[in-house]
């Protein structure tokens, strides 16, 4: 039987100004869908897998073809409905409505488990969309680099007086998300030892300059770390091995990294985490033949892995969960103190979320890197006092290789996002940019996610699991005129542990686009300030007052 999810073909987004669709409002989602499956972007594009275990862009190749065909004929007064990667309907709406509405892997809470999802998945009734895979705004590993960089910089401020020179970070996983860690560490001034079981991933990170060296043994990797830290150099090494073996071995040897984290795809025990003692080939085969055996072995390995992280924490090493739900699995497997160390959001990122600051991103539909460099310059011009951001943009230009369509990630917040969006739109109108840009973000943002073991862990008022907020965020983005809006379940941390929404808006240089951009790029981050103000965070309350937000049940205005 032919696998409907496997097809040996290369997909790449069109570039330039010639349209395949009826307008830029439908050309934009078409190109970004294709960009998600570019061989330089996606992890397993022939299987429709973009990143994060089995995060897909479309349910089957037949569905992909139908989405493409529909987008090419969709008018500016129609909206395409996509249900878990399948184009199920086209409806008459209006010009300011989203052109595409997407819902991925959403399940009624009682049934929101991997077992139930996998059953639906096998029947062809569902698709795991991760966060930006099924919402068509993945830009490669750059998409998470700045967030990781901000985390490491803040950890350096809190624990090492703001100086990571001569320090090293231990982590695991070099997939679509984890691959950001070594480069982010180096940008923050630290060395990094990243453990990865799949050599092809290490090689890919070497090729795209996200990692500096490769090692086959722990001793070889440690020798490089020792050499670099003593010389005060910031460099990274990808060690081919299993984190469930390497982390405990380092504990056994009494070796103390300066920061410990992990970004293996532990959120998906079957497809995302190699059990200790298994080869990659054996693992891939048993995912099909005996998935339950894989799950049992992977979960047992995660317990060992997290136990080692707790050991590092108890040694006084700053240790953080980077949002893959590995602590939850370890606790379910009997490790009572699995949550001894914190997640990265409550430890380092929440003050940014309180001001609506998060992973704003844009991609140049022209395909020309110069369009991105021009927008980089515009960001500096409009935000002249944000030297930290200027430093990031300079490092990004120097170190980050574009994957697929040229793109940029840039953490900015309420009051700045709409300003940048309007400026980019004017650059398209004037011809300074060769073609329109799309502006979006990760679902990991201040007002668009409920994830009690990650973004909303340890909320001040105990509202960690309240998922009204991402639903309201999606609804408001629809009402505001985003070009496409998505609502997903299970991204980052797996089934049953998160709900989250995304939006993308196209800046095509028109007056209509300007009006939509101003609404969307103000309202979207404002929901994050609202959510954190409602939880009682003073930073968010002050920001809401400063920006003049009308929050009757919170500010009484």
UniProtKB/Swiss-Prot annotation:
Residue numbers annotated as active site: 410
BP-aspect Gene Ontology terms: L-histidine catabolic process to glutamate and formamide; L-histidine catabolic process to glutamate and formate
Keywords: Cytoplasm, Histidine metabolism, Lyase, NAD
Residues involved in NAD(+) binding: 52-53, 130, 176-178, 196, 201, 242-243, 263-267, 273-274, 322, 492
InterPro entries: Urocanase (IPR055351), Urocanase-like (IPR023637), Urocanase_C (IPR035401), Urocanase_central_sf (IPR038364), Urocanase_CS (IPR023636), Urocanase_N (IPR035400), Urocanase_Rossmann-like (IPR035085), Urocanase_sf (IPR036190)
Any one GO cellular component localisation term in the record: cytoplasm
Function: Catalyzes the conversion of urocanate to 4-imidazolone-5-propionate.
PANTHER family: UROCANATE HYDRATASE
Official protein name in the record: Urocanate hydratase
């Amino acid at each position: 039987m032919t696998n409907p999810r496997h097809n040996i073909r290369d997909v790449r987004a069109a570039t330039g100004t010639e349209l395949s669709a009826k307008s830029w409002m439908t050309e934009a989602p078409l190109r970004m869908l294709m960009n998600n499956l570019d061989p330089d972007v996606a992890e397993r594009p022939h299987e429709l897998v973009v990143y994060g275990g089995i995060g897909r862009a479309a349910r089957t190749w037949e569905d992909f073809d139908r989405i493409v065909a529909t987008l090419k004929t969709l008018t500016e007064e129609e909206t395409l409905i996509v249900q878990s990667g399948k184009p199920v309907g086209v409806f008459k709406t209006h010009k300011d409505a989203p052109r595409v509405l997407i819902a991925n892997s959403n399940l009624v809470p009682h049934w929101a488990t991997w077992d139930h999802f996998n059953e639906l998945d096998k029947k062809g009734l569902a698709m795991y969309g991760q966060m930006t895979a099924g919402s068509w705004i993945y830009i490669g590993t750059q998409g998470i680099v700045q967030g990781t960089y901000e985390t490491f910089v803040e950890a350096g401020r809190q624990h090492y007086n703001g100086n990571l020179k001569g320090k090293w970070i231990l982590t695991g996983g070099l997939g679509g998300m984890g691959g950001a860690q070594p480069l982010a560490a180096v940008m923050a001034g630290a060395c990094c030892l990243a453990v990865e079981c799949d050599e092809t991933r290490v090689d890919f990170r070497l090729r795209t300059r996200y990692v500096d060296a490769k090692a086959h043994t722990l001793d070889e990797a440690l020798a490089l770390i020792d050499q670099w830290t003593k010389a005060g150099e910031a460099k990274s090494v990808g060690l081919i091995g299993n984190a469930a073996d390497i982390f405990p071995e380092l504990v056994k040897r009494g070796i103390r990294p300066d920061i410990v984290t992990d970004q293996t795809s532990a959120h998906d025990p079957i497809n995302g985490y190699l059990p200790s003692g298994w080869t990659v080939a054996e693992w891939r085969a048993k995912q099909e033949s005996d998935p339950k055996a894989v799950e049992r072995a992977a979960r047992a390995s995660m317990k060992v892995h997290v136990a080692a992280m707790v050991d590092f924490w108890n040694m006084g090493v700053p240790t953080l969960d980077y949002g893959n739900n590995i602590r939850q699995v370890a606790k379910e497997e009997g490790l009572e103190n699995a949550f001894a160390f914190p997640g990265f959001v409550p430890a380092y990122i929440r003050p940014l979320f309180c001001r609506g600051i998060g992973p704003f991103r844009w991609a140049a539909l022209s395909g020309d890197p110069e369009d991105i460099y021009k927008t980089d310059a515009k960001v500096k011009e409009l935000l002249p006092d944000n030297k930290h951001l200027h430093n990031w943009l300079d490092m990004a230009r120097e170190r980050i290789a574009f994957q697929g369509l040229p793109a940029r990630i840039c953490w900015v917040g309420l009051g700045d996002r709409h300003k940048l969006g309007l400026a980019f739109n004017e650059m398209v109108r004037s011809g300074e940019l060769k073609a329109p840009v799309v502006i979006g973000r990760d679902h990991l943002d201040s007002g668009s996610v409920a994830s009690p073991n990650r973004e909303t862990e340890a909320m001040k008022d105990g509202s960690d699991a309240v998922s009204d907020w991402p639903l309201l965020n999606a609804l408001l983005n629809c009402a505001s005129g985003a070009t496409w809006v998505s609502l997903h379940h299970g991204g980052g941390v797996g089934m049953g542990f998160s709900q989250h929404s995304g939006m993308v808006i196209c800046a095509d240089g028109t007056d209509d686009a300007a009006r939509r951009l101003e609404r969307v790029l103000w309202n979207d981050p404002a929901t994050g300030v609202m959510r954190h103000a409602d939880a009682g965070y003073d930073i968010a309350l002050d920001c809401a007052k400063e920006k003049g937000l009308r929050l009757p049940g919170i500010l009484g205005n």
